[in-house]
């Protein structure tokens, strides 16, 4: 579930910013709501600080989610949320982010939506 949590946290941040929310205010509101999770509270600060120093890595979630999906396939069990998250991590790895922190999956949503949280990122 960690990979899905990280992907949805990145998606929520990009969506909220696109809707006009202040990134730090959005983080605080969700942190105090039922939508919060350990992954939200741990990974979103990396996004807000543009700090993708690897504590874990995109490539790890590409591998781990592939294992989960393979098991689901063997059991003939649908895993649509896992599959969607896996595709976002694959996109991040394909963009050259495989060895950076898994929270950098946000950069996929950033690229797709055109949102920017940090001024340093605006030209990227």
PLM region descriptions:
Residues 20-23, 78:
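Helix N-cap / loop-to-helix initiation motif
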Residues 22-32, 83-87:
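Beta-strand segments within the central parallel beta-sheet cores of soluble alpha/beta enzyme folds
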Residues 1-19, 30-42, 56, 60-63:
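Active-site-proximal catalytic alpha-helix in oxidoreductases
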Residues 115-124:
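ATP-dependent carboxylate/acyl-activation modules
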Residues 36-103, 107-109, 120-121:
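Interdomain hinge/lid region at the active-site interface
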Residues 6, 10, 14, 26-29, ...:
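N-terminal hydrophobic or amphipathic segments with adjacent small-residue motifs
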